[in-house]
Design a protein with these regions (language model features):
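Short helical segment in ABC ATPase nucleotide-binding domains corresponding to the A-loop/adjacent helical element
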Residues: 99-107, 117, 121
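Conserved ABC ATPase signature
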Residues: 136-140, 144
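Catalytic Walker B motif of ABC-type/P-loop ATPase nucleotide-binding domains
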Residues: 161-164
């Protein structure tokens, strides 16, 4: 069964640039897929469409059981709970500790505090950075920042995990 189903998707920006032109992709649950191409090919727009940061102009798009063409604004946070994203620049919050950066992803979806503490410590253990729980992003190496971004992306047990430039 497809976890991502994109059919004839078109995305044009206001400046006239067409970022996606008739894109059709089907990705099954448990499948790994790589989107490759030169700069400006639309890879980032493709990713941003998957978690509804950008709206598509034409076509159909289903992600983790959500119809992203018809999704209501109030349902977007629940979609994003099911789509974990590791951003190219990590997007860590500089004034928050490692713990707070990861916990924030659970707080915004209304998770209980006791569940947050337990789960944050589990994912920190998983990425091997429990000892950095009180550190701030600027105190971490690039690789450690990436692992914190991964921990944040998986803390809500998403159905889909997306990594933008994962190298």
């Amino acid at each position: 069964m497809s976890i991502i189903e994109m059919r004839d998707v078109v995305k044009k920006y206001d400046n006239g640039t067409t970022a996606l032109r008739g894109v059709t992709v089907s990705i099954d649950a448990g499948e790994f897929a790589y989107i490759v191409g030169p700069s400006g090919a639309g890879k980032s727009t493709f990713i941003r469409a998957l978690y509804r940061e950008v709206k598509i102009d034409n076509g159909s798009l289903q992600v983790a059981g959500y119809n992203l063409v018809k999704i209501k604004k109030k349902d977007v946070p629940m979609l994003r709970r099911n789509v974990g994203v590791v951003f190219q620049d990590y997007k860590l919050l500089p004034k928050k500790t490692v713990y707070e950066n990861i916990a924030y992803a659970m707080e915004v979806v209304g998770e209980r505090r006791r569940n947050i503490k337990k789960r944050v410590m589990e994912v920190l253990d998983l990425v091997g950075l429990k000892h950095k729980v009180r550190s701030f992003p600027n105190e971490l190496s690039g690789g450690e920042q990436q692992r914190i971004a991964i921990a944040r992306a998986i803390v809500n047990n998403p159905k889909v995990l997306i990594a933008d430039e994962p190298t």
